[in-house]
Amino acid sequence: MNQYAASQPSRKKAVFSLLILLALTCVIVLILRDHWAEITAALAQLNLWQVLVVLALGISYPLLEGCVSYVIVRGRLHGFTLRQGIDNAWCGTFGNVVTLGAGAVPVQTWYLHQAGLPIGPGVGLMTLQYVFHKTTVLLYATVMLLLQHKWLAANTTGVLKYLPMAYAVVALVIVALVLVCVSPLVQNLARWALGFLPKTEKWQQRRADWLEQLDVLGTESRLLLADKARCVQIFALQALKLFLLFCLPWLCIRFMQLSPLSFARVQLLTSLMLFVSNALPNVAGMGSIETAFLLLYSSFLPSGEVMSVLMLYRIASYYFVFAASAVGFFLAQRRLTRTPPKEA
């Protein structure tokens, strides 16, 4: 397995990534500056308990992601605990930011390897967890669209007219990713396509690594999909994770006493926001969410209110979660040094 499949983020790279994060935050603040008075007035409506509820919903996302890790890994690594699953989620969240979006799976694989799981199965299981997440995002957005497509069509203007095209493109990408993981036919086609890579030493090494990862992914997917009860648990946890995340903008609107937008409408718009963000470029999880949020919500709320909701939503779902993940990551490291690894 490729030596970069499992890696611990370096301190130098982490500092550089934090500087990039700070720069991007400054850019967002500059974008919001014309509505700063409205944003601060809206945030001033919040009391302590409302802030705690919003932050609790934000932190529920990585905690439920940790529950998913626990359910996925425990069948492969006997003795893997719920706390280790949550530690693994902290590693993924922290690694995703400090490696500018490239390191969630490698850092999680590194943690699982330290906990006793070989690198190959670790990469396979974390890739499958990612695929379960993307599949649930697709299914959730599709159900919301089916239930409320008439309302959305009647209120769609401007760039939102291109939403069906964006939906189709992202859906095709997610379906292709799922098929690579679960379909032997598609895996064989992928192996055949890799045979057309350049015959240089560098590309042939990459081909060998990718072929090995395909084999491991096929093995792990067959083992996991054979356990139907575990798959149902994973989908249920993923759906709950998304439901709570999609409740967050609705609570932000209610707590800041902004223009009313029903709970069902917010569920639809936020699920589409997360879905469409998959088609947009991002750096360390920033950029795509903000763009998709403004795109979806600007047709239904005044500009100042959209900016206010976006600000509180990102504080709870990104900045607070990242700060918690930094603490969680270093505590996970400390626990690893105190606990001998268990064999898979």
Describe each region flagged by the PLM:
Residues 1-41, 92-204, 282, 286-344:
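Transmembrane helix-loop-helix hairpins in multi-pass inner-membrane proteins
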Residues 10-11, 47-49, 78-87, 117-119, ...:
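Membrane-helix interface segments
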Residues 13-16, 45-53, 222-236:
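Membrane-interface helix starts
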Residues 38-45, 213-225:
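A short amphipathic helical element positioned immediately N-terminal to and/or at the very start
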Residues 51-55, 82, 86, 123, ...:
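Hydrophobic alpha-helical transmembrane segments
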Residues 64-91, 252-269:
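Membrane-embedded helical hairpins/re-entrant loop segments and their flanking transmembrane helices
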Residues 83-92, 128, 264-275, 305-313:
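Alpha-helical transmembrane segments of multi-pass membrane proteins
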Residues 221, 225-272, 280:
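Transmembrane helical segments that form the transport core of multi-pass membrane transport proteins
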